[in-house]
Amino acid sequence: TGTPRKKSGIPKKTGNPEDTAESTGAQEAKHKAGVDARIVRFLKKHHVLTLATSGEGAPYCSNAFYCYDAERNLLIFTSDMATRHAQQMARNPCVAASVVLETKVVGRVEGLQLCGKAARADEAARRAYLRRFPYAALAELTLWAIAPDFMKFTDNTLGFGKKLIWNNR
């Protein structure tokens, strides 16, 4: 929210409460793209995202099963070209998405919001998706991949409202 961030994805210390939670784990090994390992673990643990697209003068949301390719920092999902969101992505690849842990326990709240570009997925993405969802091999798939350029992970296990920011804009 207007807080300056380094291109590497490691936030600057500004004293802003929205800044990332600093802890002994904050210096843990980073993913190739500089994504904090806690974000990678969260994305790998879950499998449903809410996708936001825009077109025809209005935003639109849909849900999809996804797999996370940590090596390439891609969220891969399937969507038929006849769907409203696929048609919108084909015209405007700028998307947003969220992944949440549904819980009533405030101290366990976790959720990720991201922005990025969506494009048709390649063969490597297809293999990754089928490893996660083998039954999908029975269907004709139109796969998409989101390459995030910004992620904000809220993790109340680090303290109420603590956030980790990854920014590659």
Features from the language model and the residues they span:
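Short beta-strand segments
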Residues: 46-81, 89, 95-100
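Extreme N-terminal tail/first-helix region
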Residues: 1-6, 12-13, 17-48
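Charged, gly/pro-rich active-site loop segments
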Residues: 28-31, 106-169
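Short, basic and Ser/Thr-rich N-terminal targeting/leader segments
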Residues: 45-47, 60-62, 112, 137-140
